[in-house]
Amino acid sequence: MAPLGDGGAAAAAASNNLVVSFGEMLIDFVPDVAGLSLAESGGFVKAPGGAPANVACAIAKLGGSSAFVGKFGDDEFGHMLVNILKQNNVNAEGCLFDKHARTALAFVTLKHDGEREFMFYRNPSADMLLTEAELDLGLVRRARVFHYGSISLISEPCRSAHMAAMRAAKAAGVLCSYDPNVRLPLWPSPDAAREGILSIWKEADFIKVSDDEVAFLTRGDANDEKNVLSLWFDGLKLLVVTDGDKGCRYFTKDFKGSVPGFKVDTVDTTGAGDAFVGSLLVNVAKDDSIFHNEEKLREALKFSNACGAICTTKKGAIPALPTVATAQDLIAKAN
């Protein structure tokens, strides 16, 4: 499948190609020098983040149609983030402001290999306070794909809002896309995280998990296919496991396989999984026959691997998101 190029942007703007992302958007503070602890870091670079918002921006940057639903503090950071969504051509009509809570912050420790550790300030932050009554369910029902993570499941009232939006999407025949995006420091305990993440597992049509998340959820070796397949259920259309720079594995009812990744100079892995998901959802929204056509799926996953790889070459998530041209260039150079 050819990913959306310049000629596909107009078609993507049609509402039947709309991907609505639900959840959190926050400010990541990334150290200006990798390999130091938060206490040792001399300075930090401010970067917009939050997995569902990263996905929305990734889709729009690739010429797709995306919207974001979530709540922000009525503060400078909150307004800055919503403006960033708009600047990235993301529909922000589902964005709300809370006068009594702050926008969430995260301090990110960068290891020498670009992997990360997080320290969050969100107790409670505005995104946690979104209520069911505040939802724009009309926007959700207009989507071709409804995408979400698990952080919005951690506490009320956001959990109830998440469940209501998901129910509305399913009732309207919208495809449900789930990337758990495990962040253990935000959950009361690892067991609570596992239980919460799996509580909505069987509602999804498409699930993307990392190899580390497979290991966490199954308490087993992510390289053992038996453990991966324990996450499969009847009704799931596609399960994708991302394996970092090694690429990804895919599983459908009728076929399974793997697609190799791309070698790049990794600086910061923040947002790589979101770039991967966003690029895949652009293609799913455009043509969901990729769930049944292995050749199309493999081509789409190759493009997604390229998008994820490119995102690791700069600090921060949204600023590092690829364009169609940069992804195609990486693919061409690797051939």
Curated annotation (Swiss-Prot):
Membrane-spanning intervals of the chain: none
Catalytic activity: D-fructose + ATP = D-fructose 6-phosphate + ADP + H(+)
Keyword line: ATP-binding, Carbohydrate metabolism, Kinase, Nucleotide-binding, Transferase
Gene Ontology molecular function: ATP binding; fructokinase activity
Domain of life: Eukaryota
Tissues showing expression: Expressed in roots, at higher levels in stems, and hardly detectable in leaves.
EC number, UniProt record: 2.7.1.4
Regulation of catalytic or functional activity: Inhibited at high fructose.
Pfam families reported in the protein's UniProt record: PfkB
Gene Ontology CC entries for this record: cytosol
One BP annotation, GO: starch biosynthetic process
Pathway(s) this gene product operates in, as recorded in its UniProt entry: Glycan biosynthesis; starch biosynthesis
InterPro entries to which the protein is assigned, alphabetical: Carboh/pur_kinase_PfkB_CS, PfkB_Carbo_kinase, PfkB_dom, Ribokinase-like
The protein's role, per its UniProt record: May play an important role in maintaining the flux of carbon towards starch formation. May also be involved in a sugar-sensing pathway.
Family: Belongs to the carbohydrate kinase PfkB family.
Annotated protein name in UniProt: Fructokinase-2
Gene designation per UniProt: FRK2
